[in-house]
């Protein structure tokens, strides 16, 4: 298994920091990568889940554009942003949040804790949809949560996505490793999960297509899994 603790807390963090080499400043208000702790659960977990939590007990990384006039000017004057957001009365702070990245992997001591999961927003979505299956939050975002799902006493390595505004729960048809690889490839771009599932139908598709290669143009980005070609120079 890839060392995901190192991939996010070292490799991605370095890539974020080096955006300054082409004039883009990014800040990382949250960076957490804790040593591993034993998973406290009687559930039968797939080996890949155990192997991941043997690397780290908690992983969190947030990045956003540094909000200074000289740093944000190229984005605020971008024609796509002007036409699709600013002219439609969306604030710059709203747009800036869309142009950010976040991964928030649940800590090992609560990932399979019943009370913890019942207190999360995704539970209200399940109740609204009258879904009684047991889900466990793996990556908690503001509007989407990537989860594992229990079958009897077994938790297979299959990622499900719960969107606060959706009318169903989505089987992403990927496991933990592919999920984390996709998160890295997208630089944890906000709602990358929706782009992966729905492609061009997702509102975030065009944002990812235009701005990940721009923000990270100091490195080779691979967004092919999202049906985005980044081979051309930016």
Segments (PLM) and residue ranges:
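Charge-dense, low-complexity intrinsically disordered regions
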Residues: 182, 193-234
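Alpha-helix initiation and N-capping motif
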Residues: 10, 46, 173-177, 189, ...
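Compact, glycine/acidic-enriched structural inserts
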Residues: 158-191
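Coil-to-beta-strand transition motifs
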Residues: 142-144, 152-157
């Amino acid at each position: 298994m890839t060392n995901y603790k190192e991939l996010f807390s070292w490799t991605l963090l370095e890539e974020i920091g080096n955006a300054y080499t082409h004039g883009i400043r990014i800040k990382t208000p949250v960076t957490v990568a804790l040593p591993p702790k034993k998973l406290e659960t009687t559930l039968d977990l797939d080996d890949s889940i155990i192997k991941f939590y043997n690397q780290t007990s908690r992983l969190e990384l947030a990045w956003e554009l540094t909000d200074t006039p000289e740093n944000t000017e190229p984005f605020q004057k971008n024609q796509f942003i002007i036409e699709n957001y600013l002219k439609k009365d969306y604030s710059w702070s709203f747009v800036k949040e869309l142009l950010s990245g976040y991964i928030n992997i649940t800590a090992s001591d609560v990932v399979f804790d019943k009370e913890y999961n019942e207190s999360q927003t995704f539970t209200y979505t399940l109740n609204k949809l009258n879904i009684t299956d047991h889900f466990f939050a793996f990556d908690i975002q503001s509007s989407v949560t990537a989860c594992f799902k229990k079958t009897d006493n077994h938790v297979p390595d299959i990622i499900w996505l719960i969107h606060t505004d959706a009318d169903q729960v989505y089987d992403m048809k990927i496991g933990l490793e592919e999920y984390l690889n996709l998160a890295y490839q997208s630089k944890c771009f906000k709602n990358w999960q929706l782009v992966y599932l729905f492609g061009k139908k997702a509102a975030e598709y065009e944002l990812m297509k235009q701005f990940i290669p721009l923000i990270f143009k100091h490195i080779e980005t691979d967004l092919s899994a999202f049906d985005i070609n980044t081979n051309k120079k930016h």
